[in-house]
Design a protein with these regions (language model features):
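Short, charged/polar low-complexity linear motifs in solvent-exposed/disordered segments
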Residues: 26-28, 80, 117-118, 127
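Helix-centered, glycine/charged polyanion-binding patches within enzymatic domains
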Residues: 43-120
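Polybasic low-complexity intrinsically disordered regions
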Residues: 1-53, 123, 129, 134-137
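A short, flexible helix-boundary coil/loop motif
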Residues: 104, 108-110, 135-142
Length: 142
């Protein structure tokens, strides 16, 4: 999700494993570019491996703290900045996209079989959300 306007940037359907979501996130972030970008995520993203991979790609991890019986993977270099304080609100916007997909986009229950078809329908629903969001953004500026 793009933070400024809440638009879906990329989608990826993965098998339900404990690490698939993090692996897909690393694949979807851009390679080393000129500008530093951030990646927001929930507690699942607060791991040493993911933070290391993101920093190698010049991506700043803005992940929720996972304080259950271990130390944080993100250090004070990241958490002290004002942009990090904005990340929880942006993460909520990302969850709103999935809420829209489940209620309006009819993706609460998978109605198709086959990974390729389910992936296509997920991307199609994300595009529908994108169009709905674009309509609101254009209407707000008119």
């Amino acid at each position: 999700m793009e933070n400024r306007h809440g638009l879906v940037v990329n989608t990826r359907l993965t098998l339900a494993t404990g690490t698939a979501e993090r692996e897909a996130a690393v694949e979807m972030v851009p390679r080393r570019g000129q500008r530093r970008v951030t990646l927001g995520g929930d507690k699942n993203y607060d791991t040493q491996d993911l933070v290391k991979q993101l920093r190698q790609r010049r991506v700043t991890p803005h992940v929720a703290p996972n304080n259950t019986n271990r130390s944080r993977a993100v250090d004070g270099r990241t958490t002290r900045h004002a942009g990090y304080a904005v990340s929880p609100r942006k993460r909520k916007r990302g969850e709103e996209i999935f809420g829209w997909m489940k209620t309006i986009g009819l993706r609460r229950k998978v109605r198709h079989r086959g990974r390729e078809l389910v992936a296509w329908m997920f991307t199609y629903t994300a595009a529908a959300y994108h169009l709905m969001r674009m309509g609101k953004l254009v209407g707000a500026k008119a």
